[in-house]
UniProtKB/Swiss-Prot annotation:
Subcellular location: Plastid, Chloroplast stroma
Chief location of this protein within or outside the cell: plastid
Organism: Arabidopsis thaliana (Mouse-ear cress)
Any one of the GO CC terms: chloroplast
Protein name per UniProt: Protein POST-ILLUMINATION CHLOROPHYLL FLUORESCENCE INCREASE, chloroplastic
Listed transmembrane segments: none
Keyword Acyltransferase: no
Its biological purpose: Required during nonphotochemical quenching. Involved in NAD(P)H dehydrogenase complex-mediated chlororespiratory electron transport which mediates electron flow from stromal reductants to the plastoquinone (PQ) pool during chlorophyll fluorescence increase after turning off actinic light, in response to photoinhibition conditions (e.g. high light intensities), and upon long-term mild heat stress.
Keyword annotations from UniProtKB, A to Z: Chloroplast, Plastid, Stress response, Transit peptide
Pfam families: Ig_PIFI (PF25419)
Highest classification ranks of the organism: Eukaryota, Viridiplantae, Streptophyta, Embryophyta, Tracheophyta
Gene Ontology terms: biological process: cellular heat acclimation; chlororespiration; nonphotochemical quenching
Transit peptide: first to last position: 1-49
Disruption phenotype: Normal growth and photosynthesis in normal conditions. Intact NDH complex, but altered NDH-dependent chlorophyll fluorescence increase after turning off actinic light and lower capacity for nonphotochemical quenching in high light intensities, due to altered nonphotochemical reduction of the plastoquinone (PQ). Increased sensitivity to photoinhibition and long-term mild heat stress.
């Protein structure tokens, strides 16, 4: 189901359309969008990319379907926010994609990649990013997810999906902006967005798959030291692990020193 089938108002900022002068404010960060694709398919890729850069006035806003419609494959895109409210600038968003609802053929070698940008249909960071695949058993086709940390100056997200050759999209997701900014011109948002995304690693923090996020530090318990972000998902239960102690905690998996020391006769 292509994005063109969705109905809504045409692209607009809080008050003005996006000007061509401002539309490439952070394009200096755009890398070679096709470098992950096989060279033998390069011609196909160039043709496919061109279809994602439709004029902004043709990109209709995508309305949130019901989860049942998405799950059954009658709607290609679904999303949910951390607070249950509509997508809002400065908040977090999880995007779901069901290829069964589109004409995009799954490519087992490549998977599905996300291509999207804020306030314009150009990928933040340069190239499509692989989405996390979630298998649903033999009866249902897999779905794919992507995490979005919406910049404070983003008014919308324009995005497409690719299997490495073909594309589905573009779609446009509109964001709510703070009340104090609702009458600001689009130049205000684009300049602020350019400043936000010019920081090192900003694009990687804004759009990322679940599988690529590895914590760099862990919550410490008492004086324990946990090395490596790959161990942060452990359920640490501190307690006495001495089975001979009256303070033994059978659920503990980290000794926190709570077992009382037994002094020998020589120490007394």
């Amino acid at each position: 189901m292509a994005a063109a089938a969705n109905t809504s108002a045409v692209f607009a900022s809080p008050s003005q359309p996006l000007s061509s002068k401002r539309s490439f404010l952070y394009s200096s960060r755009i890398g070679p969008i096709l470098r992950r694709f096989p060279r033998k398919k390069l011609d196909l890729q160039v043709k496919a990319v061109a279809t994602t850069l439709a004029p902004l006035e043709e990109i209709k806003e995508y309305k949130l379907p019901s989860w049942a419609m998405f799950e059954m494959g009658t709607a290609p895109v679904y999303w949910k926010t951390m607070n249950g409210l509509p997508p809002t600038s400065g908040e977090k968003l999880k995007l779901f994609y069901n290829p069964a609802a589109s004409k995009l053929t799954l490519n087992e070698d490549y998977g599905v990649a996300f291509n999207g940008g804020f306030n314009q249909p150009i990928m933040c960071g340069g190239e499509p990013r692989a989405m996390l695949k979630k298998d649903r058993g033999k009866a249902d086709s897999p779905i794919y997810t992507m995490q979005i940390c919406i910049p404070k100056h983003a008014v919308n997200l324009i995005f497409s999906f690719t299997n490495g050759v073909d594309w589905d999209g573009p779609y446009r997701l509109q964001f709510q902006v703070p009340k104090r900014w609702q009458n600001k011109p689009i130049e205000f948002f684009n300049e602020g967005l350019a400043n936000e995304l010019s920081q090192d690693g900003a694009c990687e923090r804004a759009i990322f798959p679940d599988s690529n996020v590895v914590p760099t530090r862990c919550t410490m318990i008492a004086n324990l030291t946990v090395e490596g972000g790959d161990r942060c998902n452990l359920d640490l239960v501190p307690g006495c692990m001495d089975t001979n102690s009256e303070h033994f905690n059978p659920y503990a998996n980290v000794d926190d020193g709570s077992c009382p020391l037994e002094l020998s006769d020589s120490d007394e």
